[in-house]
């Protein structure tokens, strides 16, 4: 293996007493928790795009980083160098998975033919890197939003030829994801929305994206891809309004096109913030609807209205997220991908490690707090008691469709006393959660 991060040894667990910034204090991959290794509960992944493709450019300034793998030269050779750097980073960070967009790992080229050739070359190289390091692919996806051709969307584009081009791109990346043993394939519609209703046919675009998703499902079975298909909700940015606004919106879309048993969701914390929801809300909603697939672990900024993609650092927030996931049985093919980037002023190579190490420890500590909540059982007991009336014969008959509205109304007329309002005890439960986290 090449050594581009020479001063960094493979990151290991040193415990809470460690002051080493290049060590885990809470993440012990082999620690057994509820009968499963910590690494198997969390299933961490590093993203290719923020760490190895972004050069520090923002809306108001040019690239602030001087990454040696981003210097000028032959695009395909630079992609090979970037793969060397990325896999050394994955290996030294000691995480099991990574994620990519197609053009993160292979140059797009000047034609579809050149794009397909470059993907083929890089898929062989990535396969070799995976075998060498033991790092696996959590998910792959096609970038159908950056190129100017996708300014008006990919599957929702009014130009049929652009729809076709996006279809070709997705076909190639699904094949590549299968070849590399990817456990999921993600569909994120960054441009699947509108800027103005004045030039938009909402019904037409909805039919287009619905048919596109149906074809993606068909193609999954055609090529024998065994992974999970995921949609990543986001309300806006880069478009004014995206059709995959939040988890509930995505579920309604899936139901409309008969896809609710075929596609799940990849939930990003910062996207929940932009939609006006808590991270826990989106995760809990997906679980309630049976469509939780995977997580993009990051954080936004409540004072800012855009996707800041910061590393997660709140144990308080993520303990409740991990509690929801544990209560639902944990991940199957999904995991925790750090869709996060260092700040533009964090220009040192080591900053990439610091950001991920802090995020990994945050999620590990959150897992431990979530286990306390689950094992103690007091929160579950309270919720069960609060809804206990629905376990009665009457409650079951209502939910099973055995009673009509007027029959329930007649039951209400037989009540001797008015129903009593009961305390929700939110403050007590908040205190209880704080004890699990901070005691």
UniProtKB/Swiss-Prot annotation:
Q: Which reaction does it catalyse?
A: alpha-D-xylose = alpha-D-xylulofuranose
Tell me which cofactor or cofactors this protein depends on: Mg(2+)
Q: Which domain of life is it from?
A: Bacteria
Q: A GO BP term, please?
A: D-xylose metabolic process
Q: Where does Mg(2+) 2 bind?
A: 268, 271, 307, 309
Give the cofactor note.
Answer: Binds 2 magnesium ions per subunit.
The main place the protein resides is: cytoplasm
**Which InterPro entries does the record match to this protein?**
Xyl_isomerase-like_sf (IPR036237), Xylose_isom_bac (IPR013452), Xylose_isomerase (IPR001998)
| GO cellular component terms given for this protein | cytoplasm
List ligand-binding residues for Mg(2+) 1.
Answer: 232, 268, 296, 339
Cite the active-site annotation.
101, 104
Signal peptide (residue range): none
Record keywords: Carbohydrate metabolism, Cytoplasm, Isomerase, Magnesium, Metal-binding, Xylose metabolism
Location(s) in or outside the cell:
Cytoplasm
| GO MF assignments | magnesium ion binding; xylose isomerase activity
Enzyme Commission number(s): 5.3.1.5
SUPFAM superfamilies, alphabetized: Xylose isomerase-like (SSF51658)
HAMAP family in UniProt: Xylose_isom_A (MF_00455)
**Quaternary structure (record):** Homotetramer.
Family indicated by similarity: Belongs to the xylose isomerase family.
Name assigned to this protein:
Xylose isomerase
Native organism: Photorhabdus laumondii subsp. laumondii (strain DSM 15139 / CIP 105565 / TT01)
Question: Taxonomic lineage per UniProt?
Answer: Bacteria, Pseudomonadati, Pseudomonadota, Gammaproteobacteria, Enterobacterales
């Amino acid at each position: 293996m090449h050594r581009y991060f020479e001063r960094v040894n493979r990151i290991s667990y040193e415990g809470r007493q460690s002051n080493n910034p290049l060590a885990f204090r809470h993440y012990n991959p082999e620690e057994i928790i509820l009968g499963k290794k910590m690494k198997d509960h969390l299933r961490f992944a590093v993203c290719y795009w923020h760490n190895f493709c972004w050069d520090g450019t923002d809306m108001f300034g040019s690239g602030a980083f001087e990454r040696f793998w981003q210097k000028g030269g032959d695009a395909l050779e630079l992609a090979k160098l970037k793969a060397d750097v990325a896999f050394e980073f994955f290996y030294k960070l000691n995480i099991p998975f990574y994620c990519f967009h197609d053009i993160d790992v292979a140059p797009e080229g000047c034609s579809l033919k050149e794009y397909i050739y470059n993907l083929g070359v890089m898929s062989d190289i990535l396969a070799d890197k995976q075998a060498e390091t033991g790092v696996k692919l959590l998910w792959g996806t096609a970038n159908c939003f950056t190129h100017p051709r996708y300014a008006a969307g990919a599957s929702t584009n009014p130009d049929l030829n652009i729809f076709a081009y996006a279809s070709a791109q997705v076909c190639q990346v699904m094949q590549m994801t299968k070849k590399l043993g990817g456990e999921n394939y993600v569909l994120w519609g960054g441009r699947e929305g509108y800027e103005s209703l004045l030039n938009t046919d909402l019904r037409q675009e909805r039919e287009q994206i619905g048919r596109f998703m149906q074809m993606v499902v068909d193609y999954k079975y055609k090529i024998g891809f065994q992974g999970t298909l995921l949609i990543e909700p986001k309300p806006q940015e880069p478009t004014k309004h995206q059709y995959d606004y939040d988890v509930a919106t995505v579920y309604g879309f899936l139901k409309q096109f008969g896809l609710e048993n075929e596609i799940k969701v990849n939930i990003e914390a910062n996207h929940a913030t932009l939609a006006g929801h808590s991270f826990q809300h989106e995760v809990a909603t997906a679980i309630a609807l049976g469509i939780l697939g995977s997580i993009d672990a990051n954080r936004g900024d409540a004072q800012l209205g855009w996707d800041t993609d910061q590393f997660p650092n709140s144990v308080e927030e993520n303990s409740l997220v991990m509690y929801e996931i544990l209560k639902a049985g944990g991940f199957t093919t999904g995991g925790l991908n750090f869709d996060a980037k260092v700040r533009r002023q964090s220009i040192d190579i080591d900053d990439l490690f610091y950001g991920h190490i802090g995020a990994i420890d945050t999620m590990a500590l959150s897992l431990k707090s979530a286990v306390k909540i689950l094992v103690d059982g007091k929160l579950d007991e309270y919720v069960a008691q609060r809804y206990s009336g629905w376990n009665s014969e009457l409650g079951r008959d209502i939910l099973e469709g055995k009673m009509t509205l007027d029959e329930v109304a007649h039951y209400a007329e037989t009540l001797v006393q008015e129903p009593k309002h009961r305390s929700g005890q939110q403050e007590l439960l908040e205190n209880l959660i704080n004890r699990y986290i901070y005691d």
